[in-house]
């Protein structure tokens, strides 16, 4: 694998600006004239987000022990921590960007079990302590690109998914990996009320091809900014696939199952013409209702400082992952 261009702290997205909202099958958030093509709820979110003082405070996570390998450092500017943890898409806790931080305190993460099953020789289950102690943790500074055409740079902490899968020993029949979020309607109000949860079918499910899951960039993430993930960011463990749109990054995972057939995925089930299975970041393949050619980078500034920049193919990781899709029509397999 070619060496990944380092990101710098200047490129990391502040914690509080992390997630922007889609209502139902939401439209991308825009500014000025571009915003006219987007939903009023998304427009309102953008301006309310940058008011400043009324943003919800992220709960403090416990400090984690981790290494900082040189290969994963970067000169990119980080998104501030309060934006990453205060601006989220996690419909199980509501549709507004501030809802997850305000409502996710009800999520119980201890005890926790993560089951690895399916087409494996050695199925097993991880408990809460295993998530942060079974595999060495490392910090990786990754670009993060939302399908809504905004982006961040985030210092995630976790371990490569391939290490977990290697212990399970996939069989020759394993072709895909299916992921499932916790189903706990009493703790996750969006699962109980279709209005709160955007009308999606729960629990949230996602999937990858096995070769995508085994790629060194694919990260099982347990922390951010040096601390354990807060609930609104997908505690206690979530998936990060940096060359794909953010909705592939399933949160609060309780099941990883290796399968022979391609698994169903939540947003693809909800709107298959808008959200594909692959969801690779691609400036040449627009969403049916907005362009993906550019993105708004959310950094440390306010609304007048939001930077619009070109979208990078595979979110800037083409050298590392383009070979996975050799011969695949990326327009048809979006």
Curated annotation (Swiss-Prot):
Subunit record text: Heterodimer of a catalytic subunit (MsrP) and a heme-binding subunit (MsrQ).
Residue sites binding Mo-molybdopterin per the record: 88, 91-92, 146, 181, 233, 238, 249-251
Swiss-Prot/TrEMBL catalytic activity: L-methionyl-[protein] + a quinone + H2O = L-methionyl-(S)-S-oxide-[protein] + a quinol; L-methionyl-[protein] + a quinone + H2O = L-methionyl-(R)-S-oxide-[protein] + a quinol
Necessary cofactors: Mo-molybdopterin
Gene that this polypeptide is encoded by: msrP
Signal peptide: 1-44
Record-given protein name: Protein-methionine-sulfoxide reductase catalytic subunit MsrP
Origin organism lineage: Bacteria, Pseudomonadati, Pseudomonadota, Gammaproteobacteria, Enterobacterales
Record GO biological process: protein repair
Gene Ontology molecular function: any one: oxidoreductase activity, acting on a sulfur group of donors, quinone or similar compound as acceptor
Keywords: Metal-binding, Molybdenum, Oxidoreductase, Periplasm, Signal
Co-factor note (free text): Binds 1 Mo-molybdopterin (Mo-MPT) cofactor per subunit.
InterPro entries: MsrP (IPR022867), OxRdtase_Mopterin-bd_dom (IPR000572), OxRdtase_Mopterin-bd_sf (IPR036374), TAT_signal (IPR006311)
EC number(s) given by UniProt: 1.8.5.-
Cross-referenced Pfam families: Oxidored_molyb
UniProt-annotated location(s): Periplasm
Gene3D superfamilies: Oxidoreductase, molybdopterin-binding domain
Species annotation: Salmonella dublin (strain CT_02021853)
Function: Part of the MsrPQ system that repairs oxidized periplasmic proteins containing methionine sulfoxide residues (Met-O), using respiratory chain electrons. Thus protects these proteins from oxidative-stress damage caused by reactive species of oxygen and chlorine generated by the host defense mechanisms. MsrPQ is essential for the maintenance of envelope integrity under bleach stress, rescuing a wide series of structurally unrelated periplasmic proteins from methionine oxidation, including the primary periplasmic chaperone SurA and the lipoprotein Pal.
